[in-house]
Design a protein with these regions (language model features):
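NAD(P)+-binding Rossmann beta1-loop-alpha1 motif at the extreme N-terminus of oxidoreductases
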Residues: 1-63, 88, 93
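Rossmann-fold dinucleotide-binding core
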Residues: 8, 95-164
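Hydrophobic alpha-helical segments typical of transmembrane helices
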Residues: 15, 35, 49, 69, ...
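Short amphipathic alpha-helical segments
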Residues: 16-18, 40, 72-75, 102-106, ...
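A short acidic, helix-capping loop that chelates divalent metal ions and anchors anionic groups
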Residues: 35-36, 70, 125-129
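Acidic, glycine-centered active-site loop in nucleotide-sugar glycosyltransferases
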Residues: 41-43, 76-77, 85-87, 128-131
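Rossmann-fold NAD(P) dinucleotide-binding segment
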Residues: 50-115
Length: 164
């Protein structure tokens, strides 16, 4: 599975690093492009923009600091939604709210993709060691598809029901 990872901050950087260390093919992107180089040096590729990353990947993970930034990544110029289609999964691990996740998730569904919200618990230190807890809201079939990825970055992964 090819993974796009947008948001390489305190938590996102640790999660993306776990995926790279465990052999996943990962494209990375951050508003602060200086954060990308360490991941590229570790074997990741640099993504051009959310649309290109969605086109190139099966799974797009966003781990961003606010609902507004998530909306921009998904709906803005060169946003991920423009390339979302059947066979594409969007995993939202950002700091956001349930209404915004459901709103963007419905747009993903309308485009033919599959959304999953994956809030985490455990902080940066646990994210660095793959010891966080992940609470996944989505359809069971989508959960089953991404479970191998989620168990790479988290020790406890729980399917909590539908999106949001």
């Amino acid at each position: 599975m090819k993974i796009g990872f947008i948001g390489l901050g305190n938590v996102g950087g640790k999660l993306a690093g776990s995926l790279i260390r465990n052999g996943y093919d990962v494209l990375v992107r951050d508003l602060d492009t200086s954060l990308e180089q360490d991941f590229v040096d570790s074997g990741a590729s640099r993504g051009e923009n959310p649309a290109q990353m969605t086109r190139a990947c099966n799974l797009l993970i966003t781990c961003l600091p606010s609902p507004a930034i998530s909306a921009e990544v998904m709906e803005g110029k060169d946003g991920a939604l423009g390339e979302m289609c059947a066979g594409k999964i969007w995993a939202e691990m950002s700091t956001t709210d349930d209404q915004e996740v459901r709103r963007l998730g419905q747009k993903v569904v309308d485009a033919g993709g599959e959304p999953i919200d994956c809030p985490v618990s455990g902080g940066c230190h646990r994210a660095a060691t793959g010891n966080i807890s992940i609470f996944a809201g989505t359809e069971r079939s989508t959960f089953d598809k991404v479970l191998p990825v989620l168990t790479t970055i988290g020790r406890r992964v729980l399917h909590t029901g539908p999106l949001g």
